[in-house]
Amino acid sequence: GYLGGYAAPAYAGYAAPAYAAPVAAVAHAAPAVAVAHAPVPSSAANTYRISQTARLAYAAPAVAHAPLGYAAPAYGVARYAAAAPALGYGYGAYGYAAPALGYGHALVH
């Protein structure tokens, strides 16, 4: 994975329904959610690791619940987002993704 821009293709990048199924099993991983809400560490390495784990916690549930099978922003509450970016850069016309590090709400417009 990587820190900026769109969600890593292995997880959700432009995820079509056919690609959504493999990550759906991770959708309710409690340990990942717990790590995602942990305080931001001072170590850049830990920040990177947590951001990757948080991407599973936030992007995977969206893949499991979004009506169109796309990776919608945090927890899948946005109906028509194209791909849930890792750090909150959303498609403005469809919804914004909550940042991966500890924010649990999507801003839906």
From Swiss-Prot:
Keywords: Cuticle, Repeat. It comes from Locusta migratoria (Migratory locust). Component of the cuticle of migratory locust which contains more than 100 different structural proteins. Sequence repeats lie at residues 7-10, 15-18, 20-23, 29-32, 59-62, 71-74, 83-86, 97-100. The keyword Disulfide bond does not apply. The tetrapeptide (A-A-P-[AV]) repeats found throughout the protein are also present in many proteins constituting the protective envelope of other species. One of its GO terms (molecular function) is structural constituent of cuticle. This is Cuticle protein 10.6.
